[in-house]
Amino acid sequence: MSSVGIASASLWLRGPVKSALKGRWLSCEQMRRYGTKSAPAVRKGGHSKKARQAPSLPFVFGRHKQLTGPEFTRRTRIGNLSDKITKFEQLKLLPEVREVMMKVIASESVLNKSLDDEDCGLDDKRVAAFLGQVQPTPIQTAVIKKMAKTLMEPQLQVHMVAAETGSGKTMSYLMPLVDYLKQEEQAAGTEEGRARLGALRSLILVPTHELVEQVYMTLEKLQEPLQLKTFKLDRDTPYKDIVEAFKGRVDIMVTTPGKLRGLFKIRMLHRPDRILSQVRFAVVDEADTLMDQSWVQETYSCIKSLRDANHLVFCSASVPMEFEKAMNKLFPNLQVVASEKLHRINKHSNIKIINVALRPYNGSKMKALAQALYAIMKDGTSEGYEKRCVVFVNEADSVNSIVDTLRDKFGHDVHGLTGEHSLDDRLATIAPFMRSPPRIQDQVRPSELKKPQERRLPNSNIKVADSKDNGQRSVSSPLKVLVTTDVLSRGINFKGVKHVILYDVPAKSIDLVHRVGRTSRMNERGHVYIFVGKKGSAQAKGLNPVVKKNRPIQ
């Protein structure tokens, strides 16, 4: 919501109304009751109709407000930067960095429809063909432009990057990071000068080993074209590999706070404190997780080890109120770059509510799940490609029973994943979902069939093709299903996942934002199915208007 909207709302509240509300956000009913009655007279032609409309108020999901409201995003104004800057060439980056990073984006983008489940190198013709369509996202434009102004200045600069899921945040911090490293090399001049840059030059901290793997897959693509040494420190990294890596030079390392602190326990490693003191650029990704009560001591201990850092970047898709308070207390000079779409569900997400308390489900979520998966298979979309669906549950104990039922009773290609699985199992399970969907050669194409009649599934707003379409075969696509908990709701860049099912309604608004954010990434269209019962159905049904009106979740 704009600052003009806030000011207008404040002017509308007069006398006892303003004092009674004590500065709280108004509900829609309160706005209808008080807003228009106390509105000042508008001269003819003095204000547009749009200016007189009530501001877009946050939608409180759950029992309590958790996320920061629109006042947080007003700390920095991205404004119309994305309208003025539409090409990476307009941003201040070294030419070699710009060229390589654009190729990386083209090789990973969910918008590049020519990609399939095969690994794609930067010199692949499919990458070259897509380069003309690669443009900076609003958050990338804002972050690169802001950091470029003082990128090489020696004092500590602390930034917070906050933007909606699927907006390109990883590249928004990677581009300044890589640009910093290459400019530092240029300033060092000779090979001898570059050798003195430090054993560890930059660091990326993430909360899970799945994210370590995901970020490292991107970093690997930078090694050869930019001559950068990248390294991942995860649960399975042998001690000898760690020691060997630091004998030379590591330009970028990605790890978790726990593994970083573990360096001090390796007797073979000489003076890990000295190694960490050489870091000049550090990123804390999924920062709201790494700075919450269960992680903050470990994370902050890592940060304090970086005694000579020039840049410290915190990156997050959600900003809880407690997180904002902690950051302001720890870093008084914090510079915020926040998207105006923060905490908003992507408008391309189609929210579908299924009341499992009603017939024909009669309280059976499993019946509703089987019906929803059937509808996804038969909806006639993703012609020629495998479909993917992620099912979120609240409790890890539910995963195995759901997987067994879907596989044994309904014959689905389904996989389950919780934090209790080993790292190797987790990585193997999510690997297909992190690659682009494969082509299906023998699929019946919808264009070859008569257009089927649509019917609505009972007690839901889901429409599917009628399988009784005059004896014609209904359109069906292979479907791969992943059942998981919130362990995979954050940061994972699922590719080709256009369907997300909330088997259990999350208790917290922050979990809702992250679960829904696994689809509709980079403004791609996606579908979200929410199962509700007698309780909570009214609030869940309010999500569709929230999405259409672009209201933030709080």
Curated annotation (Swiss-Prot):
Keyword Hydrolase: yes
Span of domain Helicase ATP-binding: 150-337
Entry remark concerning the domains of this protein: The Q motif is unique to and characteristic of the DEAD box family of RNA helicases and controls ATP binding and hydrolysis.
SMART domains referenced in this protein's UniProt entry, alphabetically: DEXDc, HELICc
Sequence motif: Q motif, positions: 119-140
Motif annotated as DEAD box, chain positions: 285-288
Residue range covered by the transit peptide: 1-54
Region (Disordered): 439-474
Pfam family name, one: Helicase_C
Residue stretches making up the Helicase C-terminal domain: 368-554
GO MF annotation: an example: ATP hydrolysis activity
EC number of this enzyme: 3.6.4.13
Catalytic reaction list: ATP + H2O = ADP + phosphate + H(+)
Residues reported in the UniProt entry to bind ATP: A163, E164, T165, G166, S167, G168, K169, T170
Domain of life: Eukaryota
GO terms under biological process: maturation of LSU-rRNA from tricistronic rRNA transcript (SSU-rRNA, 5.8S rRNA, LSU-rRNA); mitochondrial large ribosomal subunit assembly
Cellular location(s): Mitochondrion
InterPro entries in the cross-refs: DEAD/DEAH_box_helicase_dom (IPR011545), Helicase_ATP-bd (IPR014001), Helicase_C-like (IPR001650), P-loop_NTPase (IPR027417)
Top EC group: hydrolase
Organism: Eremothecium gossypii (strain ATCC 10895 / CBS 109.51 / FGSC 9923 / NRRL Y-1056)
Protein name as it appears in the record: ATP-dependent RNA helicase MRH4, mitochondrial
Annotated Gene Ontology cellular component terms: mitochondrial matrix; nucleolus
Keywords noted in UniProt: ATP-binding, Helicase, Hydrolase, Mitochondrion, Nucleotide-binding, RNA-binding, Transit peptide
Gene for this chain: MRH4
Protein task: ATP-binding RNA helicase involved in mitochondrial RNA metabolism. Required for maintenance of mitochondrial DNA.
Family: Belongs to the DEAD box helicase family. MRH4 subfamily.
Ranges of Basic and acidic residues composition bias in the record: 445-457
Chaperone among keywords: no
